[in-house]
Structures are given as structure tokens and as C-alpha cells.
Amino acid sequence: MRIAKIANTRGVDSDARKHHHAGWMLLGCMVISVFLCYGQIRNSKALLAVCLLAFLGFVVLSCGRNAVFAVLLYFLPWSPLLRLDNKSVSFFTIALLAVCLVYCLKDHLSFNTYQSVLAFFLVLLTLAAKLWQGNPIRNNYLFFVCMLFLLPSVVEKSNAVSFKEATLFFAAGVVMAALIAQQTAGLPNISKYINVQSYLSITRRSGFYGDPNFYAAHITACLAGVQLLLSREEKRVHQLALLALMVLLIYCGLLSASKSFVLTTAGLFLAWVPILLEKGHRTSKFRLLLGIMCAGAVIVSSSAFEPLFEVIDERFSYAANISQLTTKRTDLWMDYLNEFAHNVSLTLLGHGYTSVTLHGWASHNTIIQSVYQFGLLGAPLLFIWVALTLKRVRQGLKDSRSNWRYTLLMLVGVVIPWIALDILFFDEFFLLPVYVVLGSHYSKE
């Protein structure tokens, strides 16, 4: 009995130390992001250089504390500001590559055979496509190739990742970036990073991103994670804190006036129902349902949400047909499909991962973008590579059993918005699928 008590005490002390370290890591992230924003406002190259170096050092430091995934998710909404000017490469991309190199060096450059072979053939296909289409090799392509070879070595360490910690860091980063961007969007040195769309009586915020839908996709991904934490939380104080966080995320999402955010959020709450109906502690479940109803009442009745609902209502009022509902995305999709039907070489090989678009317009659909960039020969190789990478994530977890309800919720929050986005050129393509797998295997930590 005494041994059991000692073991239990040690476990509690260990958890307390982990939470203590996580708290300091989160505080460090917040301090860096605040000074980063101030440096951009003042256009101080010296301060920006210090912040960017501090960011890189902080990310490398977090590798040794098994908190790198959480730290990267925190800074994901800040990535547009993580650069010396709006034309240079984001240091977030550099940090992601640095993390992969650190872990690969720890493993003495060991590579997975199957994924390396897939990556090799994908590189050959893209180089052939570039040669055929006359497209140059640029830095974003080199980064993509490096990630194809290096990322599989990193995801094997996912057993040390805390989904709860990652979600809370992600939420803190999203909320801070959204609210600070809302207040600083009019400043000249910040406005060059932000695209605030205003027409008629509609104003659309996008955090520090140039696309409101891209910004909203971060929020739906994070919201799915918070809902998952809520469904497993039994402590009253923690439930209240998570409910407040959920309300904040919905507020930040509505700032985008994004129709896809509204539809995805509705899908999230529908996918949440089977999880809430799972067997569990009745008192805790009842308290949670009561809290959700109270949160809904706050959202509906709050004066802070009223103008946001008016903007959303006005946006939907213009949607007389499917083309207007999707903001002419369906027209773009038909243009791309028509191009595939008349251009055999493009359909088979693609453009070889370039910034080339059809008539200067992006496809606004990740699947169409995959075919346009990699062709029907390369796109399946890419999807198989992703599937094998996520399989390695799953195998590295303590509990390899997934919950289909959790998987559905995470897929709705993360993947559904990609139907209206071109995600392949962004760091989210490598990070967020891992987040989905971590959520689908989440158990009370």
C-alpha cells in the first residue's frame, strides 16, 4: 500500500512538473510573439532579427522537452509575421525544416525505405514535369523535397506529444493572433501582411493572413481539438475554461465572415453529438451539456456577436446559386477540369510543384491542386506518402487504437476546409494531418 502511495505521489509530482514546464513554454511563446508584432509595427530590423533568432532557438530548445509540436502550432497563426519583410521567406518554414534536421541527426540520418522510395519517384516525376513545362526549380520546391525525405523520421517521436498541450498552445496562438491583428490591421507596417476585405457593409478579418478562409481553417482545426478536450474533461473549472475558449474561437472565426467557417463549424457540432452521447460520468456529462447551452445563449445574445451575425447573414443573402455560395469556386473548378480534359501532358505529369496557376487563378481545392501540380501519376504517390507518414504517427503512439468518432470530428475541422483551399504550398500540409491523428487517438492524459 505504501509503495502504491509513493508511486502515485511521484506520478502527481511528474504531472505537476510537466504542467509547470508547459506553462513557462507557453509564456515564452507569448513574449516572443508580442515583441515580434511590436518589431513589425516599428519596422525595427534589429528587434525583428532578435525575435526571429529567439524563435528559432526556442523551437530547437523545445525539441529536447518534447514540446516542439505544441510550440509550432502556437506560432502557426503568426507565421506571416515571422520574417524580416513581407517579401522574404517565413522563419516558420525554416524552423520546421530545422526541427526535421535535428531529429534526423539524433537518429543518425536513418530514413524509412518505403517513404524514401516514394519521395524519390515523386521527385523524378516533378523534375520531368518541370523540364517538360519549362518551369524553374525554386526554394519552395526544395523545401518540399526536403520535407518528403525528413518528416517521416520526425513523426516517429509523436508518442511523446501531448494532444491536450498541443491544442491549448494552438488555441492560445490563434486567439492572440486574431485579436492583436484586429487591433493593429490599420497600421501601415502591419497592413502589408494583412488583407482586410471591405465591401458594401461587409468587413472580413483574416488574422495575420491574406485570406480569411485560410485563417478560418486554423480556427476550425483548433475548435475540433477543444471540443475533443471538452468531451473528455470531468473537472468543473477546466470545463468552464474550455467552454470560454470555445466561445472565443467562434468569435475569432466569425470575424472572417467566412461562409466555409460557418458551414464547417455547423459540421463540427453535428460530429460532436456522437461523442457527447458516449457513456461516461453522468454528472459530468450533464454539467457539460448545461455549459454548452449557456455558451450558446451567450453567443446568441451577446452584443459582441450581433454585428458579426449581421455580416454573415448578408454574405449568405447574396448566395442565390451554388456559384455565388462558393464565391465562384465551382466556376474555377470547372475551368481546371476542362483544362485537364484538353491537356493530356498536364493531366498526367502536372506542373511539377510550382506557383503556376490557370489564368492567374488558384484552384481553391486541394485535390484539384494536387492533380494540377503532380498529375494523375504523381498525386497518388503523394497521397500514399501522406498515408504512410500518418501510419507511422499512429504506430508511435502509446495507444494505437483510434476512435472513429474522434477521427470524424478532427477530419471535419481540419480537412473539410481544404476543399476550398490550396494547401499544398503551406506548412499546414505537413503539420495538421499529424494533429488529426493525435486527436483520433486521444485518451484522457
Q: What are the language-model segments listed below?
A:
Residues 199-205, 284-288, 299-334, 355-358:
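Flexible juxtamembrane loops connecting transmembrane helices in multi-pass membrane enzymes
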Residues 318-377, 393-398:
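Long extracytoplasmic/lumenal interhelical loops at the membrane interface
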Residues 29-35, 270, 407-417, 423-445:
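Transmembrane alpha-helices of multi-pass inner-membrane enzymes
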Residues 54, 126, 164-193, 209-275, ...:
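Alpha-helical transmembrane segments of multi-pass inner-membrane proteins
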